[in-house]
Curated annotation (Swiss-Prot):
It holds the Pfam family THF_DHG_CYH. One of its GO terms (biological process) is tetrahydrofolate interconversion. Catalyzes the oxidation of 5,10-methylenetetrahydrofolate to 5,10-methenyltetrahydrofolate and then the hydrolysis of 5,10-methenyltetrahydrofolate to 10-formyltetrahydrofolate. Signal peptide: none annotated. This is Bifunctional protein FolD. Homodimer. It catalyses: (6R)-5,10-methylene-5,6,7,8-tetrahydrofolate + NADP(+) = (6R)-5,10-methenyltetrahydrofolate + NADPH; (6R)-5,10-methenyltetrahydrofolate + H2O = (6R)-10-formyltetrahydrofolate + H(+). The keyword ATP-binding does not apply. NADP(+) binds at residues 176-178, 201, 242. It comes from Gluconobacter oxydans (strain 621H) (Gluconobacter suboxydans). GO terms for cellular component: cytosol.
Length: 304
């Protein structure tokens, strides 16, 4: 079989409906929040902090607030100026850590140059770190201990589980080794008993590795990096990337890290961009916030 002309499966890929799966998860969270509150527990609260005035981030943060209210949670938005110092942000996080009405804290990335994102994520109390990026939750994940899992990798895993009930022994290749997606994704796949390969910017044979993948997760931020001849016939492809690129008539369009039109005839299952991984990220944020509220309540019940 030629590497340049991969054998095609008998039919095109099935689209993994991220919107539909995210909607079902959000609806489930809403029902569970209502039940949690009916039992006399505090309404779960999510605080989102945005530093700066990036329009895209503002839209994203406001969308999170809308979804938070939709499932019956409290939303606390903190919009800080671009000039905010690291100490000022850390002071706010300390206040949010101490606030019993807040069960989850998310600081929108990226942050201005004067603020160290590692210091900020580690300042969030581990039981309120609903993005799962602090060193405590990252350490728990690497050790296979239950903790809060980063939203995007968790969403990717749920999409994979909608296709594969058992991933034991499957070869999973993750392209991209970021702390945000690639590394935690690899840990989650290991927990599913996959054989995991991680490719990164210094990997010399990324294309060849991708061609061996039963499961291919791509999170590089490089638009349409993965072409059709990178895909193993019948593979499941999860495209985490999203980039706005020029289109005809002076317009723009959104594309992923995978050349969808080329991959679609080859893959067995594939996520679209948009409408694949993106909706799952916010749904998993709400899921994590409810889990954090439950954990906080369990500690309170045990100590009373």
């Amino acid at each position: 079989m030629s590497m340049l002309s991969p054998e095609k499966p008998s039919e095109p890929a099935k689209i993994i409906d991220g919107k539909g799966i995210a909607r079902a998860l959000t609806d489930q969270v809403g029902r569970e929040v209502a039940k949690f509150v009916e039992q006399g527990n505090t309404i779960p609260g999510l605080a989102v902090v945005l530093v700066g005035n990036d329009p895209a981030s503002e839209v994203y943060v406001k969308n999170k607030a809308i979804q938070t209210h939709r499932v019956g949670m409290r939303s606390f938005m903190h919009m800080l100026p671009q000039s905010t110092s690291q100490d000022e942000l850390l002071d706010l996080i300390a206040q949010l850590n101490a606030n019993p009405k807040i069960h989850g804290i998310l600081v929108q990335l990226p942050l201005p140059a004067q603020i160290d994102p590692v210091a900020v994520t580690n300042a969030i109390a581990p039981h309120k770190d609903v993005d799962g990026l602090g060193e405590v939750n990252a350490g728990r994940l690497s050790l296979g201990i239950d903790g809060i899992v980063p939203c995007t990798p968790l969403g990717c895993l749920m999409l994979l589980q909608s296709v594969h009930k058992d991933m034991t022994g499957m070869h999973a290749v993750v392209i991209g080794a970021s702390n945000l997606v690639g590394k935690p994704m690899a840990q989650l796949l290991l927990k599913e008993n996959c054989t995991v390969t991680v490719a990164h910017i210094h990997t010399r044979n990324t294309k060849e590795l991708a061609r061996e993948a039963d499961i291919l997760v791509v999170a590089t931020g490089k638009s349409e990096l993965v072409r059709g001849d990178w895909i193993k016939p019948g593979a499941t492809v999860i495209d985490v990337g999203i980039t706005r690129v020029p289109a005809e008539n002076g317009k723009t369009r959104l594309v992923g890290d995978v050349a969808f039109d080329e991959a679609f005839p080859i893959a067995g299952h594939i996520t679209p961009v948009p409408g694949g991984v993106g909706p799952m990220t916010i749904a998993c944020l709400l899921h994590n916030t409810l889990q954090a509220a439950r954990a906080t309540q369990a500690v309170a019940d045990a100590s009373s």
